[in-house]
């Protein structure tokens, strides 16, 4: 399975100590160089702990950096470089999944994938956690704890209503 990630899900999962969950679902994740810079380079310069967590998974070979080859596809600059590169890398590598949280980037990715006939599906941080619960990587209690941890981090740009929806969805299931 080929999985490409943007910065957002990596940073969010690192902030709640859930990067191991990502690699419980996928053996490796591909990222463009711009995402490594956004998550590790910029993060280390700012001294944020989540950058060290992402760097540790990169050093362990779980996060593979793959260059985006030149593309005929022009993407608007309304989304950031990591998101644009993630979309292009997903097309280039015929990815099964693109992990991205930003709504504009998700909408653009859906449009581009449809136009290009790509079968790449899109999932964000919440989708990763719910899938981890669904597949048994996380227990219900662990999933709920991680979802609630997202609420405690206002710097993670996930809408509170979406987090609450995910909490309700997981809480409704019995183990």
Predicted segment positions?
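A positional/architectural concept
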Residues: 2-69, 76
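Ordered, amphipathic secondary-structure segments that act as subunit-interaction surfaces
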Residues: 61-101
């Amino acid at each position: 399975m080929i999985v490409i990630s943007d910065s957002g899900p990596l940073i969010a999962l690192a902030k709640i100590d859930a990067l191991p969950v990502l690699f419980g679902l996928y053996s490796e994740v591909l990222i463009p160089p711009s995402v490594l810079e956004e998550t590790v380079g910029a993060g280390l310069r700012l001294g944020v702990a989540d950058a060290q967590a992402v760097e540790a998974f990169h050093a362990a070979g779980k996060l593979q950096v793959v260059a985006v080859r030149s593309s005929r596809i022009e993407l608007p600059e309304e989304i950031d470089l990591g998101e644009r590169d993630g979309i292009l890398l997903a097309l280039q590598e015929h990815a099964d999944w693109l992990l991205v949280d930003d709504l504009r980037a998700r909408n653009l990715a859906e449009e581009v994938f449809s136009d290009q006939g790509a079968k790449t599906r899109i999932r964000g941080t919440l989708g990763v956690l719910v899938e981890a619960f669904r597949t048994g990587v996380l227990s219900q209690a662990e999933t709920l704890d991680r979802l609630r941890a997202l609420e405690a981090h206002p710097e993670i740009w996930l809408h509170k209503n979406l987090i609450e929806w995910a909490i309700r969805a997981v809480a409704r299931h019995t183990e």
